[in-house]
Amino acid sequence: MKTFFLTSMLSLWAAFTCVCAEASNADDGADLRLLNRIDFTPLLTTSGQPAEADFALIAAAGYDRVIFLAFTNHPKAVGHEDHIVRELGLQFIHIPVEWESPKLSDFNTFAAVMQTQGSGRTLVHCEVNFRASVFGFLYQVLFGGAELDAAMSLMHSIWVPNDTWEAFIARVMTDNGVDYQPL
């Protein structure tokens, strides 16, 4: 009886150890190297343009969708990014945002996509993570419950928005009922 009990306990322990080892070996994306990467939350990451080979790593890291905020003619753009991403089983959303004149409608489209496309893991990117970090900052503050200073600190870790983008931030905040004074 003691032998049966001991054998059963060892079998359970071995099974538990295997399950834990498999879970700890899952790719959470922590080693994924993306230009100017910001992890606003475990479900929202922003970055600069990934290389073509990075998209397979992004999929393996458990991302469900990619939102691209730049234009396809920038120097580091990946040709047919939409096809590459979709072939990997991820959603691809392209919201081209003019660098010199971001529009309130651009952010509203982004926020609507974030809210209606499920709660999966999302990578938002542009050319160098300036547009994307602003959108990530705004989304987290307005819809994600983040404190303004904490989200801003993350954005400022890669850049301080210029006058155009600071005015855009103020316009989006005001439109959403938040009193925000540009820097």
Predicted regions and their residues:
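Short, surface-exposed ligand- or partner-binding patches at beta-edge/loop junctions that are enriched
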Residues: 125
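Bacterial N-terminal signal peptides
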Residues: 7-17
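Cys-dependent protein tyrosine phosphatase-like superfamily
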Residues: 20-122, 135-183
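Positively charged n-region of N-terminal signal peptides that target proteins for export
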Residues: 1-4
